[in-house]
């Protein structure tokens, strides 16, 4: 029998404490970093992190090997199922990189001729994964050389590592097929493939991540999963881990199979797990929060662990991978000292895991336990977290009927059919980033920085006018991030200097920390909007980030309901919208790209969420008069699940990421009777390629088949912050040309029918 471990974490970050992998990747893609250098960077990061975890005292160390982009994409490579369009792509193996690296990155980023795979959010987080593309004819061909090499390297370095892989159910549940077949048709076959793979792994333990087991899974599928894991269990040392939700379904499905361990997320739902566990396998208790930044209540956690230990073997872990939190609090030197004591980043969470495991074995670190108790008491009684009184009525969340608003807006805006616009941000050039850095370092005065941003806004306005766009944006040069910008201007938030987490690939974000009562001390965007609007006769959109997205993309206080915090943010945005209207804004965009992320994974819990999420958005926007058009933007979402909520938001225009998913959202819009304005994106900005006119025209034609042309907008998928000016200009020329061509066709059809 494989001996049990006592302390571990669910998974590891890959990007590096100082974003080393990000810079190596971007250098490799641009040709300034060699394949050998990229491989060495990934190797160093993997080795150093394993060393740190071992030194911290963990007795089982998770490893995914050298990952260059995403765990789901790693699994696609492992199973040999890159999309068909890339299968004939000639690989050019670089020393130190896997032989499939060209197909790997083509799947993630596309090529000049071929689009990338779809990308969407990982369950209810702000991390993104590459969606596998399968078909009924898919054949899995193990390509495990890189994985086995990486595991062997760590074993020779003396580490007790545990490979972490995406499990069969989760991999297939998150896949899409190109022929309409069911990905789960491959379930039994994939279990057979994993059986062969696990037999080759030289480690006592192997971890298979099955977060899909916390979602709604059909009973017949659970039976097939149970049968599959019964086969894998014979290997010994198989640890099936779940996270992001209650573990009752997983425990019921997997109990009694002879698995070595089952992991559950006690942060999301500890009570259910306590009831469901029968004490037969090692329970890996995810009791340290892996996706938020607050210190653990060590005394309460130890009490829970002791109750579990009375029923069977227990190991201490994080609730999910530490991919979702910053590396270490020690890198932050400028935080509010009081709030700092309330926090724990990745390094500190590992220390908490070890302390709890030691305490469970009878060795209590009294200084750490006392410090945690003192911090929790201070946070509970701090004036920074005091409640804000708000007398909110149903009328505060309501506007006039859409038909009334649409008539007023059509008269106020006088736009052509199929109006063209962008989502908000324009390229953040080296000059913009330099000016911001120099300003923060004190090398530019506020006046000099303001002048630099105003000059950039003027350039963006001129460029849009030259391109022929109908509704303009100011380009957001003053914003380093669409959430952090507002967090720095609202009370109740703090921001970090090195609190980076991976969003996707080389893209990293620094989520702000929402620690207290949210208020708006002064206007945040009005002066930038007013300057932009003064430069043009065309309408310029006021640009705000919505309350749910600010919530979803921040580390949020966990001592009051999310609905209460969302309304606090909404009231601050409501004040900003009132000021924008007073400054002359006729269109105000309130982005909610993250509204899908916080949706509970089980249907029984979703209605309550959508009520308060929709309510917060409407609370922020309902102050706008009828003639002011409210836009919102959404991306990376499974819109079919949210179509009713999108309608309930009651935004006048909703722009949606759609190009990468071949306009799949259109069917949902059509079947729902969606009657509001909509702009399904016709250009995938996440791929570094300029779309062909025929490609954009085809997407626009598809949209016209499902959307009333009087309510259809033409726009890219997302903001243009990460793109260069050359590709942005070229792509927008294509977008405008496609819109003009479609307008001509509409007018011709109208004259013919007349």
UniProtKB/Swiss-Prot annotation:
Active site (catalytic residues): 686
Record keywords, A-Z: Amino-acid biosynthesis, Metal-binding, Methionine biosynthesis, Methyltransferase, Repeat, Transferase, Zinc
Residues reported in the UniProt entry to bind 5-methyltetrahydropteroyltri-L-glutamate: 19-22, 121, 507-508, 553, 597
EC number: 2.1.1.14
Coiled coil spans: none
Membrane-spanning parts: none
Binding-site residues for L-methionine, renumbered to this chain: 423-425, 476, 591
Cofactor notes: Binds 1 zinc ion per subunit.
Gene Ontology MF annotations: 5-methyltetrahydropteroyltriglutamate-homocysteine S-methyltransferase activity; zinc ion binding
Function: Catalyzes the transfer of a methyl group from 5-methyltetrahydrofolate to homocysteine resulting in methionine formation.
The protein, known as: 5-methyltetrahydropteroyltriglutamate--homocysteine methyltransferase
Organism expressing this protein natively: Corynebacterium efficiens (strain DSM 44549 / YS-314 / AJ 12310 / JCM 11189 / NBRC 100395)
Protein encoded by which gene: metE
